[in-house]
């Protein structure tokens, strides 16, 4: 009897260990937006604690049409939204034009830490060209921190990707962001690693300037760092960035310009919205053939009413080295976390969807 009790105890411990180690996986029905909503709601409830075990929401290829719903929230921590493919898994909403706004339109609103998105498209289908002077339609509003996006496409026009946390940290790898005006905007530190940036037409006929980024860096040291990104341009001329307010920071390193003639001569917009204190820099810009087309000097005088702030925006190789990922996020190392989660996501895909 004693041996039986010991055996039962061992079995219970083993079962408990297996139960603890088992991945938390929520499957979404293909193309079913309501199924996606319920999956996110379930994950939010069970991962309310910041130390919660990571949960993976598996989203098969299909269109998940949220209709006019806005600000679908992620409030649970350590939640992964894993699509089947970047081009095939599409989460879309279409806010009415009268709801236009940076706080009132997002497809997904993240309020948690440790959120991971991979292999999907977020599309905000607000009718930008019918919206008048402003057509703000956010795809991913990040009020949380330590978000990682891997192979995520964001389709919109104005304010497409909004980092809405002054202390937020974000890392994007091999992702694609489309837009026209300030379509990468906000606060905190965000590192764009070999991403594709697509500037769309500012107006239907292509007239009017395009601005990629509008940082409002306040309480962090780095702002927006673009490393090894490619910029594709659709007809309208564009600037890298303009200052929003506070102390904007932005740097483009090792950038490939597919249509360099569409970049304004100033490269950065000198007209600040609410500040002239812009730390905007550039290093080793190339054309589509890999030729270095960086000017030797580019002094931009940032201006706001009677204030002026001249800045040499071209930096040296030694200055560029300070923007290494390990320096920017020394206690996070998101590239290592991404590699680990991506491997797990691929394993789960094979289990649930078969060989790819």
Regions found by a protein language model. Name each.
Residues 1-7:
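Bacterial N-terminal signal peptides that target proteins for export
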Residues 8-15:
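Bacterial N-terminal signal peptides
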Residues 17-21:
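Sec/Tat signal peptide C-region and signal peptidase I cleavage site
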Residues 22-29, 33-356:
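Sequence-level preference for short, compositionally simple segments enriched
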């Amino acid at each position: 009897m004693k041996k039986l009790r010991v055996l039962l105890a061992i079995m219970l411990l083993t079962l408990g260990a297996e139960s603890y180690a088992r991945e938390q996986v929520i499957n979404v029905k293909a193309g079913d937006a309501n199924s996606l909503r319920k999956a996110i709601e379930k994950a939010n409830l069970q991962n309310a604690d910041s130390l919660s075990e990571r949960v993976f929401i598996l989203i098969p290829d299909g269109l998940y049409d949220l209709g006019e719903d806005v600000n679908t929230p992620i409030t649970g921590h350590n939640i992964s939204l894993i699509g089947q493919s970047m081009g095939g898994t599409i989460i879309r909403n279409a806010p009415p034009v009268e709801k236009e706004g940076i706080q009132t339109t997002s497809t997904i609103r993240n309020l948690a830490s440790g959120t991971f998105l991979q292999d999907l498209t977020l599309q905000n289908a607000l009718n930008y060209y019918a919206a008048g002077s402003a057509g703000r339609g956010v795809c991913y509003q990040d009020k949380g921190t330590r978000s990682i996006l891997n192979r995520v496409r964001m389709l919109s026009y104005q304010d497409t990707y909004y980092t809405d946390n002054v202390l937020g940290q974000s890392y994007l790898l091999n992702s694609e962001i489309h837009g026209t005006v300030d379509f990468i905007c906000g606060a905190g530190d965000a590192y764009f690693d070999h991403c594709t940036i697509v500037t769309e037409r500012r107006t239907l006929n292509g007239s009017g300037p395009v601005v990629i980024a509008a940082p409002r860096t306040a309480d962090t040291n780095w702002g927006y760092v673009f490393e090894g990104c490619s910029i594709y341009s659709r007809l309208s001329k564009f600037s890298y960035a303009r200052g929003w307010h506070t102390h904007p920071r932005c740097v483009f390193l090792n950038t490939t310009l597919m249509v360099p003639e569409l970049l304004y001569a100033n490269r950065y917009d000198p007209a600040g919205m609410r500040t002239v204190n812009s730390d905007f820099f550039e290093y080793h810009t190339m054309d589509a053939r890999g030729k270095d087309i960086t000017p030797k000097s580019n002094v931009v005088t940032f201006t706001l009413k009677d204030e002026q702030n001249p800045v040499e925006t071209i930096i040296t190789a030694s200055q560029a080295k300070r923007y290494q990922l390990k320096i920017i996020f020394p206690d996070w190392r998101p590239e290592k976390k991404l590699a680990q989660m991506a491997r797990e996501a691929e394993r789960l895909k094979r289990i649930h969807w078969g060989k790819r």
